[in-house]
């Protein structure tokens, strides 16, 4: 039986594009997303199936929600 995901991949892609467009440095924002995903994966090691969303996608959603806070995008 196939699992149904509760997120829309098109929406995650749109949010990722918003993050990249809001950032002055594409490489830096990519590294920030990767670091946040790595941290989340370490912290949530016990709970592997949180909504069916992978750590990278969760990091993108979280960071795009925080776009109003420039310190997240800056350094």
Swiss-Prot record:
Keywords: DNA-directed RNA polymerase, Nucleotidyltransferase, Transcription, Transferase. It comes from the Bacteria. It catalyses: RNA(n) + a ribonucleoside 5'-triphosphate = RNA(n+1) + diphosphate. The keyword Metal-binding does not apply. One of its GO terms (cellular component) is DNA-directed RNA polymerase complex. One of its GO terms (molecular function) is DNA-directed RNA polymerase activity. Its EC number is 2.7.7.6. The keyword Transferase applies. InterPro entries: DNA-dir_RNA_pol_omega, Pol_omega/Rpo6/RPB6, RPB6/omega-like_sf. Disulfide bonds: none annotated. GO terms for biological process: DNA-templated transcription. Promotes RNA polymerase assembly. Latches the N- and C-terminal regions of the beta' subunit thereby facilitating its interaction with the beta and alpha subunits. HAMAP family: RNApol_bact_RpoZ. Belongs to the RNA polymerase subunit omega family. In cyanobacteria the RNAP catalytic core is composed of 2 alpha, 1 beta, 1 beta', 1 gamma and 1 omega subunit. When a sigma factor is associated with the core the holoenzyme is formed, which can initiate transcription. This is DNA-directed RNA polymerase subunit omega. The gene is rpoZ.
């Amino acid at each position: 039986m196939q699992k149904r995901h509760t997120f829309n991949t098109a929406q995650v892609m749109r949010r990722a594009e918003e993050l990249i467009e809001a950032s002055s440095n594409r490489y830096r924002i990519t590294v920030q997303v990767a670091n946040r995903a790595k941290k989340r994966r370490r912290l949530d090691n016990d709970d592997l199936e949180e909504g069916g969303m992978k750590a990278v996608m969760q990091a993108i959603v979280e960071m795009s929600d925080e776009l109003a806070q420039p310190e997240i995008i800056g350094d």
